[in-house]
A protein has these predicted regions:
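A generic alpha-helix structural signal
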Residues: 29-32, 179, 215
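Helix-rich interaction surfaces within compact, conserved domain-sized segments
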Residues: 213-220
């Protein structure tokens, strides 16, 4: 499945087998980030599995009724061009609409938004490493792909990695809009992902006075 995802991405990729220490992964990622500034690519760490491949193919090659391993590369390329040429939506508006929906649901369930959903900031831990690529059962990393996505702007990676648009997940243009908004607000860059997780790298923590607002945006 990792090979199929690398073929789907059609860009320079490095495969990392499972390991007990993620230093080699983070060293390669950090180097790729520096190199990407000069060579116009954004590095992303990807946890490969069949569900992710199915999501990518479902979005980029919707006519494909066959096995997800047998996607049409031309259709995928056209999809990328279409997504990259589309105007980027207002990310703040996308998040506000989603938060509004969550508030309505809470009201329907007789839940107090401020007390039961928001609550208070309490405790917390230092979050200084990615979580999505660790296997909690073995305390080892899962197999990973480091992909050098050939785009200039961080939010454009979703043209290559359209992993949403199922259940209540955002579609590709919404993902791009939200990622652009968070980049403009916090310099947040999509950095690691699986079929149902997305982690951003920030140069500094979100300011404490903004933390609740960002948490609500993510909850939406």
């Amino acid at each position: 499945v990792a090979q199929a995802i690398m073929e789907y991405l059609d860009c320079e990729c490095t495969y990392f087998p499972s390991m007990a220490d993620d230093d080699p992964i983070m060293s390669a990622y950090s180097y790729a980030r520096r190199l990407g500034v000069r060579e116009d690519f954004i590095p992303v760490l990807i946890k490969p599995d069949e569900t992710l491949l199915e999501c990518l193919v479902m979005n980029a090659d919707p006519e494909n009724d066959a096995d997800c391993y047998e996607f049409n590369p031309k259709a995928v390329e056209e999809y990328r061009k279409k997504m990259l040429s589309a105007p980027v939506k207002d990310g703040k508006a996308v998040l506000e609409e989603l938060t509004g929906q969550r508030k309505e649901e809470a009201e329907e369930d007789d839940m107090d938004w401020e007390e039961e959903i928001i609550g208070e900031i309490d405790g917390g831990i230092n979050n200084d490493r990615f979580a999505s690529y660790w296997d909690s059962d073995t305390n080892m990393t899962v197999p990973l792909i480091l992909a050098k996505i050939p785009v200039k702007n961080p939010w454009e990676i979703f043209a290559y990695l359209p992993f949403g648009n199922w259940n209540e997940c955002l579609d590709t243009l919404e993902l791009m809009a939200v990622a652009k908004y968070w980049f403009e607000q916090y310099d947040a860059v999509p950095a690691a992902m699986s079929h149902d997780e997305l982690e951003f790298l920030l140069p500094a923590p979100v300011p404490k006075e903004k933390a609740i607002d960002v948490a609500v945006e993510q909850y939406g």
